[in-house]
Amino acid sequence: MYKRQEYPDCEVVVIPGITAASSGAAVLGAPLNHDFCVISLSDLLTPWERIEKRLIAAVEGDFAMAIYNPSSHKRADYLQRACDILLSHGAKEDRACGYVENIGREGTKAVTCTLGELRDAKVNMFTTVFIGNSQSEIVGDKLVTKRGYIV
């Protein structure tokens, strides 16, 4: 149990749940197999320069990515900026990607696309974006990052 000094009588309880990355990945297919990372594009608490470094490290490490907070009214171009960073650091325009809007809610919408198409996608704060690694593929309407198993 953790107690903060400012509120010594307040107990913090952690309840395990399923992240938007995991639940969105299940809707989209299997984009987060092998190694992956989760990056938020919100610069409210993290400077954009640090977010940019994380994006560069992820693409240079060939990680599949789940992207939270891809766009808002004040940050309408952040997903486009993120895609431009990935493209300028080695990702190809045809890299397999996708996104899921309203995960677990009425009106869930899943879309597969390329990184080039994702750059111009209209997304919102209810959207989780998935960017495959260099081995990811779009199979039918699913985004799949293979692990190398032969089935």
Question: Each predicted region: which residue ranges?
Answer:
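Generic detector of short, aliphatic-rich beta-strand segments that form the cores of beta-sheets
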Residues: 1-2, 129
